[in-house]
Amino acid sequence: MDVILEQLETHTQNKPNDIALHIDDETITYSQLNARITSAVESLQKYSLNPVVAINMKSPVQSIICYLALHRLHKVPMMMEGKWQSTIHRQLIEKYGIKDVIGDTCLMQNIDSPMFIDSTQLQHYPNLLHIGFTSGTTGLPKAYYRDEDSWLASFEVNEMLMLKNENAIAAPGPLSHSLTLYALLFALSSGRTFIGQTTFHPERLLNQCRKISSYKVAMFLVPTMIKSLLLVYNNEHTIQSFFSSGDKLYSSIFKKIKNQANDINLIEFFGTSETSFISYNLNQQAPVESVGVLFPNVELKTTNHDHNGIGTICVKSNMMFSGYVSEQCINNDEWFVTNDNGYVKEQYLYLTGRQHDMLIIGGQNIYPAHVERLLTQSSSIDEAIIIGIPNERFGQIGVLLYSGDVTLTHKNVKQFLNKKVKRYEIPSMIHHVEKMYYTASGKIAREKMMSMYLRGEL
């Protein structure tokens, strides 16, 4: 992480009293951050650390300091999610052979597991930032390598979308989440203030943004966080832009943003932990069902097309990750095959859904995300997912689970979707839910919702 550390050192020298971190009620200047990193380096130097050191801490401030201190010691941080169940922690430590784990109270060393990631293996991945994990929504989280060059390339294109002289970046999610860690390093490398929270609390976050009068804030959030913020937002705050990632932002939320804060820029990113950014949509200028236009440094193709021309999305860019741990290294010249299906039309990317969410109804492939986006254009529906349940005649049938203040009939839904989708894409059943349940990364937990529905718990 040579470049980012050099940039951080430059900011420490040129503006030592500027705020680097504003976490909850604590503010830390660039000078103070440098001193605390130096102190952490001195403490960690007492130990014989292995090449990879896991960080599993609840405190964002301590996590940031440890992350940067490990880089000064030429170690590779592995970012673990503190909210994972202890069994998941144990499984990951055993699977990847992690010997050193920094927790909230101590450094645990010589964990009884065979060394898996060693210095020889890391030589194939120069200039690593960290080892991160996928969200693990369909199984055990999967470890991957992220290098510095890829995020420096992301910072460059991201800067093009900072259109309002934003001098602070807020990201209230856990640092183990790629979006939050990205926002932190983007802020520190560019000399801005990073605003974060131990636990997301919308009203307190807005108060943090208001506390320093000079803040012009860009917020990096998932859609569910934006929805929560709008419930307590007023025009006193200094938010200049929302950068939304992790899921498609419902058009109803965009309308609320423009009704409550017409001057705020809304930039939707589509990408993954592995690919970083793929496309963007500024102020919903793209067609409603699209996830925007490709970033200029992204190449995209689709393969394995069905009869509708929908295929598997493959991406190539200099923002790509370096590969999964224990698998082959990936370079910028290789195509990465995502788990997403979609198509490109007139320069806009359309995402039809994740491969494992696809339903097969009467022999027809159904992509729920496409229908869900249409449904959320209805003023009667806040959020919607379509799940598949077994059916003797058709193999599966689609069931719409939706939230909103209005109770709909199947006839209402059918009339709304008529002429918008094919007949077999219309859900066979509908069910109103009081609320949706979400994953740790803020996405609707499809598997949990389906399990609860099948058990009669919704």
Curated annotation (Swiss-Prot):
Name listed for the protein in its UniProt record: Putative long chain fatty acid-CoA ligase VraA
Name of the encoding gene: vraA
GO molecular function, one term: medium-chain fatty acid-CoA ligase activity
Family annotation (Pfam families): AMP-binding (PF00501), AMP-binding_C (PF13193)
The organism of origin for this protein: Staphylococcus aureus (strain MRSA252)
EC class: ligase
Classification lineage: Bacteria, Bacillati, Bacillota, Bacilli, Bacillales
Keyword Lipid metabolism: yes
Family label: Belongs to the ATP-dependent AMP-binding enzyme family.
Keyword entries, A-Z: Fatty acid metabolism, Ligase, Lipid metabolism
GO BP terms in the entry: fatty acid metabolic process
Nuclease among keywords: no
Enzyme Commission no: 6.2.1.-
